[in-house]
UniProtKB/Swiss-Prot annotation:
Pfam families: Homeodomain. Residues 1-27, 59-204, 326-429 are annotated as: Disordered. This is Brain-specific homeobox protein. The keyword Transcription regulation applies. It comes from Drosophila melanogaster. Its main location: nucleus. Residues 17-27, 105-132 have a biased composition (Low complexity).
């Protein structure tokens, strides 16, 4: 008992130790002597309280037989809990001054039955051990299961852990107030390498309609080797303006990727790139070009430059217009030969009557302009006709003109260049 007094045990623990068997008494005495060496002189320190709880837990484990019989008696359970509170308060009052009352530690008062006191102390110790044991075990499980279930939130894990602990503590929590256990939260789950599912929910969140791969994948008609047109769904043709922003066929803003995607082939792609804006001539420019063409079918380079400067056009525009006009003249001659009808090659003007037009002969080098007649009545030649007759009488030669060879294949390629300003039709008589 002297060693128990030095270890400052509670009265309930001392009484339980006195009722234990001889081997239990010897083991408890050895442990008490070992813990007495570690206690400090201050009875109110934290080490004093911790060693007191360890001694009571060891004594309760050694007297398991007596505690088991007392725990099975359900009739004394409420009384033992109330007596445990009273004994704890009395033990704290006696432990406050152990040096002033040494006799009280050696002879504690018997205020409750020994079986009930030991049962209450055992139940309290078991609840503390169970709470700490289950908390540690559950924390270990949560640490092991964290890498496997990263998609669960920490809030759900902590809620599940709290429910599991409350279910496992069972009857101990019903008889005694729950012991607040502060378990550390598991570490936050590492971020996924592949990114969250919300950000990857859409395949192409920002894919523009002008992307090459998007057009080829959507349309599915890619055939760059074919030179012919392919049958395409009309829906894609109607929606083609969404991609290029302009009508598709023959448009200046044609998209080459869309042309390939629709299966139009390399020829259509070349035509799409080659197509340019058509030149619009004004009425004075067209009048000057027509007058010069009626008097001269071919122009040399100096003459072409002079005419372009006088009309405010470029040399290329004048050359192209003359090429197209010659092709039109050939078509008119061919139509006249087939229908055996005279053709008026002059451009009809508001101040001119149709009968005043002249017709040219088949000889383009030395042919002379003869004034036409309507109904057999001759008409007086105008100043323009006189100028044309003077030009033709000079006998201009077309052997040294630079655009003579360029006119050889114009009949097949004449549809590439058009004249928008020449909207007036040539009359056929």
């Amino acid at each position: 008992m002297a060693m128990l007094n030095e270890a400052s045990l509670s009265p309930a623990d001392a009484h339980a130790h006195a009722n234990a068997t001889t081997p239990t008494h010897s083991k408890a005495a050895a442990m008490a002597s070992a813990t007495t060496m570690l206690t400090t002189k201050t009875p109110f320190s934290i080490e004093h309280i911790l060693f007191q709880n360890l001694n009571s837990a060891s004594n309760n484990n050694n007297s398991s037989d007596t505690n088991g019989i007392a725990a099975n008696t359900n009739n004394y359970a409420p009384k033992s809990s109330r007596n445990a509170v009273k004994s704890a308060r009395s033990a704290f009052a006696h432990d406050n001054n152990p040096h002033k009352h040494p006799s009280q530690h050696s002879h504690p008062p018997q205020s409750h039955p020994p079986a009930s006191a030991s049962a209450s102390a055992t139940a309290t110790a078991r609840s503390n051990q169970a709470a700490s044991g289950y908390a540690g075990e559950d924390y270990g499980k949560s640490m092991h299961s964290t890498p496997r279930s990263n998609h669960h939130s920490r809030h759900g894990t902590s809620h599940y852990n709290g429910d599991q602990i409350s279910q496992q503590l069972g009857s101990g929590a019903a008889q005694h107030p729950p012991v607040p256990t502060t378990q550390p939260q598991p570490p936050p789950p590492p971020p996924l390498n592949g990114g969250s599912g919300a950000s990857n929910g859409v395949l192409y969140p920002n894919a523009p309609y002008t992307d090459h791969g998007f057009l080829q994948m959507t349309l599915g008609y890619l055939s760059p080797s074919s030179g012919t047109y392919k049958s395409v769904d009309p829906y894609f043709l109607s929606q083609a303006s969404l991609f290029g922003g302009a009508p598709f066929f023959g448009a200046p803003g044609c998209v080459p990727e869309l042309a390939l995607g629709l299966g139009m082939g390399v020829n259509a792609l070349r035509h799409c790139r080659r197509r340019k804006a058509r030149t619009v001539f004004s009425d004075p420019q067209l009048s000057g070009l027509e007058k010069r063409f009626e008097g001269q079918r071919y122009l040399s380079t100096p003459e072409r430059v002079e005419l372009a400067t006088a009309l405010g056009l470029s040399e290329t525009q004048v050359k192209t217009w003359f090429q197209n006009r010659r092709m039109k003249h050939k078509k008119q001659l061919r139509r006249r030969d087939n229908a055996n009808e005279p053709v008026d090659f002059s451009r009809s003007e508001p101040g001119k009557q149709p009968g005043e037009a002249t017709s040219s002969s088949g000889d383009s080098k030395h042919g002379k302009l003869n004034p036409g007649s309507v109904g057999g009545t001759p008409t007086q030649p105008t100043s323009e006709q006189q100028l044309q007759m003077c030009l033709m009488q000079q006998g201009y030669s077309t052997d040294d003109y630079s655009d003579l060879e360029a006119d050889s294949g114009d009949e097949d390629n004449s549809s590439d260049v058009d004249i928008v300003g020449d909207a007036k039709l040539y009359q056929l008589t």
